[in-house]
Each structure stands twice: as structure tokens, then as C-alpha cells.
Design a protein with these regions (language model features):
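Acidic-aromatic/histidine active-site loop/patch
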Residues: 1-107, 175, 279, 287, ...
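Walker A/P-loop NTP-binding active-site region of P-loop NTPases
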Residues: 109-179
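Conserved nucleotide-binding/hydrolysis micro-motifs of P-loop NTPases
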Residues: 144-147, 204-206, 237, 261-262, ...
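Short, hinge-like loop/turn segments at secondary-structure boundaries
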Residues: 155-159, 274-275, 306, 334-336
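Cytosolic-facing regulatory segments adjacent to core modules
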Residues: 181-193, 201-235
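Conserved catalytic-core segment of NTP-binding enzymes
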Residues: 220, 230, 235-313
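Beta-strand-loop-alpha "switch" segments that mediate conformational coupling across diverse proteins
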Residues: 292-338, 344
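Extended, charge-rich low-complexity interaction segments
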Residues: 323, 345-357
Length: 357
């Protein structure tokens, strides 16, 4: 991977400057943007296999609803016809996606080399959302090499053990099986206050990063796959780290996080170029972009960014501002506003839709 372009400098691209110029002028119409011939015209937005409609379902099999007026007289009550192919409630459609069987455990990598772009928040809230629906089998791992805060913001502080302690005992834990494996691994995990997901906290000592070599990272991920169905990984900021690169190479789903700021979105775009050049075109094409609103009033730039990232990734989801997240302290999913929960439910469903059976 060292020769695959990881250390390429982030030179501004014409398509990016065109995008920002239009946003600054207030012309936030993605269809009018010049995307540069290198990428062609914007692709159609991703449409999941289970459409998340806002309108209730109407019967589509030719059967009249049970109360509908008959041609010769008033409505007659007959046997209720149940339509089970799609639920009427769009929230229930998304819940069904998250409840589906997952044939093999999936690793979701949350990435953007820029700091302060809500990687940790997105990792935690995705784990919390999926875990609240599935009830078990979801974990958030803070794989940030430089004093990540996921372990502080999520999970109960029932102990101070981190990834460092797990790696010190990794051989012993790997050799466990069945319930013994779950019990043994649990000694190194923290838990959400509502029990919806587990947390593997990162290590605060920066010297420990040297011990997270690619082989060790793969062993940890394989261990977590034995005990969990969904592994959400906060990847940190260092794209040159073998640790970061290994997680991206191993991931099933890339989640690009950003906020509506030029520097944050440009860095995300540069990262996608980097991954393309490193041979991860399929991971990039299947990626989901999360745009988080850090203030109550969305800026015009967010529409332009959404239009741009639709040309680069499978889907774009915008999640709203929520005052419960503003303090930067503990992330408590139950405290979020209903609209915020719905947005994260949709985001999680879009991420998991390709893998649900």
C-alpha cells in the first residue's frame, strides 16, 4: 500500500473550486454544477431496495381497500386484507432493514482525515441506532491513535480498560470459545447506558499506537466479528498510519463524515481520491456520506456538498443539529430529539441496506 498513493498531496481541483464558488454565490442547485469531465455528469441518487416513502402505502395488487365504496352502493365492511410486502410507516420500513438477518458480520469505517467533522458522534449514534433496533450485537471501537474521545463520550465507565489491555491479553481471549469468549471479552468492553451497544475504548497513551500494526488490527477485527454483527470503527485522522489503512482495507462499508465547511468537505473529497488511487474504487463507490449540521440553521453550502458527494458515493444523508450533542460531553441516544432519531434511523438503514437479507 505504500506505493499506492497514500502520501499524495492534497492539490485543489477545478471541480472543487467551482463547487465552492457557486455555494458562496448562493446558487445551491446541484444540477447546475460543473463537475469536471473527469467525473462526468452527476449520477442518480442511490435508491435503496426498500424505498423509504413519506406517504402511506396504497394497495397495488388490484384489491380494493376493505372500506372502499362498491359501485352499486355504500361501503360494505368485509374481511381486512393485510398488505405485508411493505409497511405503511416509513420509520417501520427503516426499522425492518435494520432488523434483517446479516449473513456475515459487517465493519463500518467512519472516516475523514479532518478533525472536528463528527466522526466520533457518527460512530456512536450509528451504533446506538442499530443497537436500539437489533437489541444486541453492535459495538463501537475507538481506533483513533491520538487520544480519541469515543470511550469518554459513550459507554459506562465501569472500568478503565482500553484496547491496550485487550491486546495484552489477545491470545488468551482469542482462544476462548462459546459463552467463555463473550464473558472474557466483556471484561474489556464498556456498555451504553441503555445496553444497546458495546464500546471498545481507545488508548490515551500516544506511544501505544506503535503496537497497532496491521496484523494486530486484523486480529482485533476478527475477534469482534466472532462476537458482534456490526462493528462501527472511528478511524481517526492519520491516513498514513498502517492502522488507518488496514481498517479501510478491511471495511465492508465506508461512511464519509463531514460538516458544511469548505476545509472539511475538501478533505473528505481528497480522501476519496486517495482511496480510489489505492485500489479501493468499490469501497468508495459504495460509500455513504453523512453531512452533519453543527448549527440550528443549515447553510446554503450543504445543498451543494450533498449534490457533489452524490456523484462520488452511493448515498448522502443530512442529519440535523441537536442541542443534546452541542456540549461535546456524553452522547446519550435517548436524549435526542425525535427528528434527530429519525434522521439517524434513515442514515443507519441506508448504510445497512445492501447487507440485509
Amino acid at each position: 500500500m505504500a506505493d499506492a498513493g497514500w502520501d499524495r498531496s492534497a492539490d485543489p481541483a477545478p471541480r472543487w473550486r467551482s463547487l465552492l464558488d457557486r455555494a458562496l454565490l448562493g446558487r445551491a442547485n446541484p444540477g447546475d454544477l460543473d463537475y469536471d469531465g473527469r467525473f462526468g455528469s452527476p449520477t442518480a441518487p442511490y435508491r435503496p431496495g426498500r424505498p423509504y416513502d413519506d406517504e402511506p402505502m396504497q394497495p397495488s395488487n388490484g384489491t380494493r381497500p376493505y372500506d372502499a365504496p362498491l359501485p352499486d352502493g355504500p361501503a360494505r365492511r368485509g374481511p381486512m386484507v393485510e398488505y405485508q410486502d411493505r409497511p405503511a410507516d416509513p420509520n417501520e420500513q427503516m426499522v425492518q432493514v435494520l432488523r434483517q438477518e446479516i449473513p456475515t458480520p459487517k465493519v463500518l469505517a467512519f472516516a475523514n482525515p479532518k478533525g472536528g467533522v463528527h466522526k466520533t458522534t457518527a460512530t456512536v449514534l450509528t451504533a446506538a441506532t442499530i443497537g436500539s433496533v437489533r437489541g444486541k450485537g453492535v459495538i463501537a471501537w475507538d481506533d483513533n491513535e491520538l487520544r480519541g474521545t469515543l470511550g469518554l463520550r459513550a459507554g459506562s465507565a465501569r472500568h478503565a480498560r482500553t484496547i491496550r489491555h485487550l491486546i495484552a491479553d489477545l491470545v488468551r481471549v482469542e482462544n476462548a470459545t462459546g459463552y467463555d469468549l463473550y464473558d472474557m471479552l466483556d471484561d474489556y468492553l464498556r456498555h451504553a447506558s441503555d445496553g444497546s451497544y458495546d464500546v471498545l475504548a481507545g488508548e490515551e497513551n500516544p506511544r501505544f499506537a506503535q503496537r497497532l500494526d496491521p496484523h494486530t488490527v486484523r486480529r482485533v477485527l476478527e475477534l469482534l466479528r466472532r462476537t458482534h454483527d456490526v462493528i462501527c470503527v472511528d478511524t481517526g485522522n492519520n491516513v498514513e498510519s498502517p492502522n488507518w489503512q488496514t481498517v479501510l482495507q478491511t471495511a465492508d462499508q465506508l461512511v464519509v463524515t463531514s460538516v458544511p465547511r469548505e476545509d472539511a468537505a475538501f478533505t473528505a473529497d481528497w480522501m476519496l481520491d486517495l482511496l480510489d488511487e489505492a485500489g479501493m474504487e468499490e469501497l468508495v463507490a459504495n460509500a455513504v456520506t453523512l453531512l452533519s449540521c453543527p448549527t440550528p440553521n443549515p447553510t446554503p453550502l450543504i445543498d451543494d456538498l450533498a449534490g457533489h458527494f452524490r456523484t462520488r458515493t452511493r448515498a448522502v444523508v443530512v442529519v440535523p443539529y441537536d442541542p443534546a450533542l452541542e456540549s461535546g460531553s456524553n452522547i446519550e441516544y435517548p436524549m435526542l430529539a425525535p427528528a434527530t432519531k429519525r434522521a439517524w434511523l434513515r442514515a443507519a438503514a441506508v448504510m445497512m441496506d445492501p447487507y440485509a437479507r
